[in-house]
Design a protein with these regions (language model features):
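Conserved "boundary/linchpin" sites in short secondary-structure elements
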Residues: 3, 21-27, 45-65, 77-112
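Short, conserved micro-motifs enriched in small and acidic residues
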Residues: 13, 73-74
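Intrinsic-disorder/low-complexity signature in envelope-associated proteins
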Residues: 1-18, 22-24, 28, 32
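Short, small/polar residue-rich loop motifs at catalytic or cofactor-binding pockets
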Residues: 38-40
Length: 112
């Protein structure tokens, strides 16, 4: 198998799963009214050694209600913190030749 074909065995779903497993220990969803409805997606770029290339940032957020609006910004802050704490990410080296930019979904389910 040539090096170019090796990445074909590592799917995007596998990469997302590996990243989620590494984020989970660093993520605690904020508490409060309707906080379980919040979903925050953070975008970040990784160097070939798994370290962060730049600062993670908010990509999207959903589930914001009048009741959980006070927790929404905290949700983003905690998600960015989790990405920073999880770095450097441990992914197969060949992944970095095909994937540099990542997104991660933070919700109540990830903290369980």
């Amino acid at each position: 198998m040539s090096p170019g074909n090796k990445v074909a065995t590592v799917s995007a779903a596998d990469v997302r799963s590996a990243i989620s497993r590494q984020l989970k220990p660093h993520w605690t969803a904020p508490q409060g009214a309707d906080a379980e409805k919040l979903v925050t997606i953070i975008a970040f770029t990784l160097n070939s050694d798994g370290t962060l290339a730049g600062t993670p940032e908010l990509y999207a957020q959903s589930g914001v209600t009048d009741a959980n609006r006070p927790q929404a910004q905290r949700h983003v802050e905690l998600a960015i913190r989790a990405v920073k704490l999880a770095a450097p990410f441990k992914l197969p080296a060949d992944v970095y030749s095909h994937f540099h930019k990542f997104t991660a979904k933070f919700d109540r389910q990830l903290s369980q």
